Amino acid sequence: MTRVNVITGFLGSGKTTTLRHLLACKPTQERWAILVNEFGEIGIDGALLADSGAQLKEIPGGCMCCVNGLPMQIGLNMLLKTQPDRLLIEPTGLGHPKQILRLLESNVYSAWLTLQATLCLLDARQLNDERLQNNENFRDQLAAADIIVANKMDTYDGDACDALRHWQLAQGDERTLLETQHGQIDPAWLDRPRTHTTTLPDAHHHHTPSAPVSGIAALRLRPGQGWRRALNQDQGYFSCGWIFSEESVFDTIGLLEWVRLTPLLRIKGAVRIVEGTLCINRQGTDLQIETRQTPPPDSRIEVIHDAEADWNALQSALLALRIRRQETPTI
C-alpha cells in the first residue's frame, strides 16, 4: 500500500525545494512518486524535479483541488498503478486542501493508499501580510495540516519571529511546529499519522486559462514552433508562462538581471544557457539560483503577480535575451 503525504504551503513557501530535499534523502530501496500541481499553465516544477529520480505527474494550469475536473484522479490513479512506496502530493500554493484530502480519505482509495501526515510550509513573514491573513486558502492550508513547517528561518527578522509565536499560541492545539531553512526536514516526519482533522469550508474559485485545459501534462511546443506563452488568472492572481524550444539559448547574466529587477511577485524557471541549465526561483526579494551541466529539453519561465502586468513588454525583454534562437514564428 502506498504511503501518501500532502505538502501544502502558499506561494513562495518553499514546497519544491522541500520536495527536492526529501527526494535526495529517500531510502535507496524505495520508489517514490510525485503528483504536482501549479497555478500556471507551463509546468515549471516538473522541470525543476526532473533529475530527482522519482516518477512524476504534473497537473498544470489551475487547481488540483478541482477534483470534479478529473485530472487529479487520473494523475493519482496512474501513479498508484505503479505501486510506489511513497507518493508526495504538492498542490498549487493557491489551492485549497479540502477536496484533495476528502478524495484521499474516501473509500475508493482505501485499498490503495494510506494517508499519512499532511505538512504545510509557512514563511512566517507572510503572517504580517494583511492580504494573506484574509486569504481563505492561506488560512485553511495551515488549518488542515498535521505538521507546520516554518521554513526560511534564516530570513526572519524579529517581527516575523514574533508573528510566528503569536500565531502558534492562537491555535490552541498541540500540533508539531518545525523550524528550518531551505526545506531541510527529516524524512521521518512523513511517517507521522494523519491525526489533525478539522472542518474546512468549500473553496470558491474560478480559473480563466488562456487555452483549453491541458489535463495532466504540461504544455508542449508543436513541431517547428519556436516559443509560446500561456496565461491564467484566479483569486486576484495572474500568471504568464513561456516555453522556448531547445534552439533558444539565453544570456546568463542578462537573464539573472531580468529576474532580479522585474517587479513581479513570483518568478520560476528552468532555462537553457551556454553552461547547461539555469534554475530560477524568486519570491519577492528572495532569489535562489542553481546551475546544472545538463541542458533542458526546452526552456520554461513562469511569472505570477497580484495584478495584471504588461506581458508583452516582459516577453519582448525575454526574447531579446536569447543569444541563439529558433526563428520560426509562433502562432
Predicted regions and their residues:
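Nucleotide-state-sensitive switch-loop elements of NTP-binding domains
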Residues: 2-13, 17-131
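Helical mechanochemical/support elements of P-loop NTPase systems and associated helical scaffolds
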Residues: 3, 68-71, 96, 134-137, ...
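Conserved beta-strand/loop subsegment of P-loop NTPase cores
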Residues: 33-34, 88, 113-123, 142-153, ...
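Short, hinge-like loop/turn segments at secondary-structure boundaries
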Residues: 50-53, 106-107, 136-138, 166-168, ...
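Alpha-helical scaffold elements adjacent to nucleotide-binding pockets in ATP/GTP-utilizing enzyme cores
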Residues: 78, 99-103, 141-144, 163-167
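Flexible active-site lid/hinge loop adjacent to a nucleotide/diphosphate
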Residues: 128, 132-144, 150
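C-terminal accessory "lid"/substrate-recognition subdomains
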Residues: 147, 155-297, 307-312, 316-331
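Flexible loop/N-cap segments at domain edges
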Residues: 303-304
